[in-house]
Amino acid sequence: MSEQSICQARAAVMVYDDANKKWVPAGGSTGFSRVHIYHHTGNNTFRVVGRKIQDHQVVINCAIPKGLKYNQATQTFHQWRDARQVYGLNFGSKEDANVFASAMMHALEVLNSQETGPTLPRQNSQLPAQVQNGPSQEELEIQRRQLQEQQRQKELERERLERERMERERLERERLERERLERERLEQEQLERERQERERQERLERQERLERQERLERQERLDRERQERQERERLERLERERQERERQEQLEREQLEWERERRISSAAAPASVETPLNSVLGDSSASEPGLQAASQPAETPSQQGIVLGPLAPPPPPPLPPGPAQASVALPPPPGPPPPPPLPSTGPPPPPPPPPLPNQVPPPPPPPPAPPLPASGFFLASMSEDNRPLTGLAAAIAGAKLRKVSRMEDTSFPSGGNAIGVNSASSKTDTGRGNGPLPLGGSGLMEEMSALLARRRRIAEKGSTIETEQKEDKGEDSEPVTSKASSTSTPEPTRKPWERTNTMNGSKSPVISRRDSPRKNQIVFDNRSYDSLHRPKSTPLSQPSANGVQTEGLDYDRLKQDILDEMRKELTKLKEELIDAIRQELSKSNTA
């Protein structure tokens, strides 16, 4: 190659813009370029060529003319101009500027020396050759090579420094990148820890909130269950109280109904007795053996009032006494006497007549013992005024009654005197304001005895009293007819306690039960103490004209029917209680 590079430098090539009065980068883009000074050995010319380091774009290519003015404006910025424009080189270092400036000076010296050299031979062609002053061509070549070598070394050193700088920059960038990554990692870890801590706190708070809410709900549920249980217990207690109150009211209503019927039956009892008395007292001239014969079957009704049935509890309805109960051997405590009877339809009995002149007036008998009821169910209807004697008091009263009867038997052997004594005793007993109603037993016997004595006295007085007696018999005939019809034709469709006794509109079976024994008690009342207490083991076996045995069978059936009804009611009540308990249990289970 005819051209050789005598120098290279790293510099930014600039061109001066005359229009804008400023330096602009050559090639339109900034950046360093490799600037060489080439020497054409054949022509002995020099030129400056610059290429971009990045894309090898030629940014400068100008010849170095002879007489060029090279201006070193600063240590790193040199400039020159040719006929077209002004060039400037902004070197990267002082070494590059010095190397390029030395090569430029050497090129200018060569060009200047070449201009003066040929002219001298032409001018002095006739003169001998002279010794050239200055370095020879070989020396210049050696210097040029040395400069190139230095330039090359500097270039290598510069490249090495550039590589080191770039390596340092790369390491610095990597370090910064690592630091950035480490910092980001730490920040990420910190954020992650904070997030986890926040989530843990939120989870703990949520769990605590849920636990607190569950505790509150459990407490509310327990409170609600306790309130419901208390409310249920209160409702059950109110329901039990209501049922108890209704049961008590039902019992009171039944007791009042039974009491009302008993009062009606007790009030109708004297009217039902008048007719059998008329039939018994129709023949006033009855003989003494006839009375003795009638005393035998009348002993059982007299014991009926003394031997009592067992005392039953107040809730069930009372069982009416019958002949079957009269033969019970165990005497229970006596019940309360019934209230005084309502006035009967017949005329009131007249006062007892004065004693006859040929008779010794009997001593006043003591008040008889209160009559014993045939059943213990009268206990619920007794009052404070007519409370009966029980226990030892009843036994003492019975003993007094026996003593008086014995005295009457010894002092007054005649039947008329006994009748008078019994009449006075009956008057004394019935005249008491708080005396019990004679329903059965000795009280019923005393009532019958009083009626018999009154009939006897009326028969002894004369015809005027006999007319009154006939009127009384006429008035008493109607109840006998109604009673006979009711006893002879019982209603098969009704139960025994529902059969209607048409006398005075009452429906009590007590009146019809007592009619037959009273007829026998009237005849039996005049007998002695021994005949009163004669033991009888069996009731009447022969059916009488009044139908005693038939009534006994009716009242046995009545007793059985009442027991059956009581069992049915108790079973029904038990089922209702069981159903109510089941309903409450089902409510509590569903709640």
UniProtKB/Swiss-Prot annotation:
Keyword Repeat belongs to the record: yes
Start-end of each Sequence repeat: 156-160, 161-165, 166-170, 171-175, 176-180, 181-185, 186-190, 191-195, 196-200
Tissue specificity field: Expressed in myoepithelia of parotid, breast, bronchial glands and sweat glands. Expressed in colon-rectum muscolaris mucosae epithelium, pancreas acinar ductal epithelium, endometrium epithelium, prostate fibromuscolar stroma and placenta vascular media. Overexpressed in a majority of breast cancer cell lines and primary breast tumor lesions.
Chain intervals for the UniProt region annotation (EVH2 block C): 554-588
Segments for region (Disordered): 115-146, 221-379, 405-549
Post-translational changes noted in the entry: NTN1-induced PKA phosphorylation on Ser-265 directly parallels the formation of filopodial protrusions.
Domain WH1: 1-111
Region (9 X 5 AA tandem repeats of [LMQ]-E-[QR]-E-[QR]): 156-200
Region (EVH2 block B): 442-459
GO BP annotations, alphabetical order: actin polymerization or depolymerization; actin polymerization-dependent cell motility; axon guidance; postsynaptic cytoskeleton organization
Gene3D superfamilies to which the protein is assigned, alphabetical: Pleckstrin-homology domain (PH domain)/Phosphotyrosine-binding domain (PTB) (2.30.29.30), Vasodilator-stimulated phosphoprotein (1.20.5.1160)
EVH2 as annotated region, ranges: 391-588
Cited SMART domains: WH1
Misc. comment: Required to transform actin polymerization into active movement for the propulsive force of Listeria monocytogenes.
Domain notes: The EVH2 domain is comprised of 3 regions. Block A is a thymosin-like domain required for G-actin binding. The KLKR motif within this block is essential for the G-actin binding and for actin polymerization. Block B is required for F-actin binding and subcellular location, and Block C for tetramerization.
Family membership noted in the UniProt record: Belongs to the Ena/VASP family.
Protein name per Swiss-Prot or TrEMBL: Protein enabled homolog
Organism for this UniProt entry: Homo sapiens (Human)
Species lineage: Eukaryota, Metazoa, Chordata, Craniata, Vertebrata
